[in-house]
Amino acid sequence: MADFLSLGDLGRWWQIVDALRQRIPTACVLCGERTQGGGLCSFCVADWHYRYKYVRWRCQRCKVAQLGGVCRAQQLCQRCLTQPQAWHALAVAFDYVAPLDSLIWRFKNYHQLRLAPMLARMMQQAMWRDGWAHPTAMVVTAIPSRRQALRRRGFNPAMELARYLARYLGLPLASDLLALAQPKADQAQKHRTQSQRWAHAQHAFIWRGAPPPETLLLVDDVLTTGSTLHSAACCALNHGVKQVYAVTLARVPWTIL
């Protein structure tokens, strides 16, 4: 099929497949209520959008949410004001809090790969929510997994999301543009403090793609401080990419950081 269909045709074909799948009666993957398509029921969809929209405050650059306390007047958090990230724009599907965080846990740690199409669709809707109009010359890639995590899981969660997202958007997917600079000595970012994350991420990636695409869409599953995406974006820009967009499934809010 890929031999005689353009990327745009493939994107439309996947939209048809997804539309047909939406008619199949299933249980909501979050609450168990009856729905269709193997995704969220209408109540959970509404709750998802409500939870993202009605937070106390959200940085317009890195999308970090403040779930309590005093509402801020400025649009950017202090880190974004003093240390701007390298990406052009960022879209986030939801905050990494209950109950939606359970979907990521099941997807990553219980090998529920059947959730990938729905999660990628949520990422696409996040891009629409932010008013993105992605360039036709954009190429999709994912943040690579550490070797230890790849051996443990058997798959890269970010790449699984990127595969479906690229299909939905009708964009090309490149799986080998970025690599970890120190895969053997690398330590999971989740075990580092914020300052350690940013220090470690300065030279965390090497560029393997040639020639570079004009515009790149970076895909990751969970954004904590933004150091990993920032480092990957810097690597891409330093090797000739003109603009870097980023989309993540979840963003850790300040109450958890």
State where each predicted segment sits.
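Glycine-rich phosphate/pyrophosphate-handling loop used in enzymes and phosphotransfer proteins
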Residues: M1-L257
